[in-house]
């Protein structure tokens, strides 16, 4: 007995429009792209890449210990178009050089606030189920780094609207 007619019918019942289905799946997985960018930003990967290109080992320096995982992150950044890759060397793109390298005029320092928000949003299911507040501490208790990231994020948002 063939299952094709049955599964085809089920698919039609659940999703009348395959575009809607694809959009739902895409929406469910978009967090992966965000996490790739935020991890690279948090580790300051973009600032570690030299203008002449850098290997994963050079990017790792003394701070990043798992070179294999770093290579996977760099390859994921390459697939997102945030770095270029030639053999074993990684290079900044025009956009990543302009916006993701510390010290540059248009550096998006406020993205660190998104890194901090990740922890809160990751607890959404637990919060809804258990009435748990993900962050109970006051803003002043969150530390200088959190406050600086928050202020920079608000500044970025204000500049965008101006």
Question: What role is predicted for each listed range?
Answer:
Residues 1-3:
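Eukaryotic partner-binding/assembly regions in large regulatory complexes
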């Amino acid at each position: 007995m063939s299952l094709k007619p049955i599964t085809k019918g089920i698919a039609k019942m659940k999703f009348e429009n395959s575009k809607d289905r694809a959009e739902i799946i895409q929406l469910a997985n978009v967090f992966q792209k965000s996490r790739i960018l935020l991890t690279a930003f948090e580790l300051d990967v973009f600032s570690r890449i030299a203008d002449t290109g850098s290997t994963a080992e050079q990017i790792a320096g003394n701070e990043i210990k798992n070179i294999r995982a770093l290579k996977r992150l760099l390859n994921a950044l390459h697939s997102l178009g945030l770095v270029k890759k030639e053999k074993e060397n990684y290079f900044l793109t025009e956009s990543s050089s302009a916006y993701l390298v510390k010290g540059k005029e248009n550096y998006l320092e406020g993205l660190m606030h998104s890194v901090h928000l990740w922890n809160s949003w990751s607890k959404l299911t637990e919060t809804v189920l258990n009435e748990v507040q993900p962050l109970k501490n006051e803003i002043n208790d969150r530390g200088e780094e959190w406050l600086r990231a928050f202020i920079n994020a608000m500044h970025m948002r204000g500049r965008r609207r101006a």
